[in-house]
Amino acid sequence: MLFRSYRRIGDKVIQQANTTLNWSSTNSDAASLGSLGSVDTSGSKSVTLSPTQTANGPVDEELKYTLNATNVCGGSDSKTVSVRVKGSIEPVPAVLLNSVFFPTDYPTKQYPALGLVRSQQETLTTLADGFKKYLEYDPDAKLSLSAYADERGPGKHNQTLSDLRAQRVKDFLVSQGIAAEKIDATAHGKENQLDKATVIELQTKDPNQPPETRVKNFKATWLAYNRRVDILLLPTNAASERFYPHNAADSQLLWQRPKPSRRAVESSSN
């Protein structure tokens, strides 16, 4: 029996099973070969082997092709060849898109690698793992980063700050095995701020509900939501969830209005 491999992710066949059928019949005037219909009494043909299974899971099917040959004297003969198709049908890999957040005034020009705290590194690691698998489904997929700063500070400073944030996220994703050319980055400075009504709406949907102290100090929470990098999956335009990590161990450092010390940020980033 012949064996061929097959793999499909979502609606895309990643590894197609193929084989070449060869046949020859003597003393015959006509022949047919299964679903291929009428064929010459001798010949060969390349066929694509598609399993009948459509559901996700392992694939292990035996496909049979029977050659029926006849002649004008009423004689007939048949021969069957079997091809076993083994592989898998898999769902489209999930890419968990969540925005990442930064402490006040980080990173800095002097310390451009500082400010991506552990909880946000974990968020990006999960995203990177999913995206690398997703590339098997769509090799042309890309990530688009949009970085922001809160409203405090001069416009030029915030433009630089958001650029540092975009670059830090890109560098981290590259360190996780994503090619740099797969990542576009745009820095918005303090433009396109989330307004307070939007932040209130986001908080109602956030599975990480804030403690009472942060509910009372809404101004600090609003500012914290605007110190972030959003992520878009292209070409689907699936956007990252803006869930603020209130339950993360380093959330206080992310949330506080004053700029935290370098030592505190280093301790939460390593």
Locations of regions flagged by a protein language model:
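Short, solvent-exposed beta-strand/turn patches at coil↔beta or beta↔helix junctions
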Residues: D11, G87-Y134, E151-K156, K219, ...
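Solvent-exposed segments in extracellular or luminal domains encompassing
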Residues: V39-Y65
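C-terminal edge beta-strand
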Residues: D77-K86
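Periplasmic OmpA-like peptidoglycan-binding domain that tethers envelope proteins to the cell wall
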Residues: K142, S146-N247, S251, R257-P258, ...
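Short proline/glycine-enriched turn/loop motifs at strand-loop junctions of beta-rich domains
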Residues: S24-A31
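Periplasmic peptidoglycan-binding/anchoring modules of Gram-negative envelope and division proteins
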Residues: A17-N22, F102, P107-A147, K170, ...
